Amino acid sequence: MTLQDLIDKLLGRQPASADTARQRLQLVLAHDRSDLNPELLDQMRREILEVVSRYVEIDLSEGDVSLETEDRVTALVANLPIRRTL
């Protein structure tokens, strides 16, 4: 999530449909390039959330684990808002 995305979210602005479509396309391309099937990605998300939850309380409703591609490099990105440490 970029700073602009955060500002837009705080101000209640809706993303442009072109931006949404671009993000979805990037996600599809990232999945294709990584050769990870959706079931494996879901399992990874659950396990990442489980491990992080052992150390800090996270906001699951706002958290996100996704694949992002930039300059032909795919990264697994976890954006997990921390409520407090345990």
Swiss-Prot record:
Job of this protein: Prevents the cell division inhibition by proteins MinC and MinD at internal division sites while permitting inhibition at polar sites. This ensures cell division at the proper site by restricting the formation of a division septum at the midpoint of the long axis of the cell.
Protein name: Cell division topological specificity factor
Similarity field: Belongs to the MinE family.
Cross-referenced Gene3D superfamilies: Cell division topological specificity factor MinE
Swiss-Prot/TrEMBL keywords: Cell cycle, Cell division
Lineage: Bacteria, Bacillati, Cyanobacteriota, Cyanophyceae, Synechococcales
Annotated Pfam families: MinE
Disulfide bonds listed in the record: none
InterPro entries, sorted: MinE, MinE_sf
The organism's place on the tree of life at top rank: Bacteria
Any single biological process term in GO: regulation of division septum assembly
SUPFAM superfamilies listed in its UniProt record: Cell division protein MinE topological specificity domain
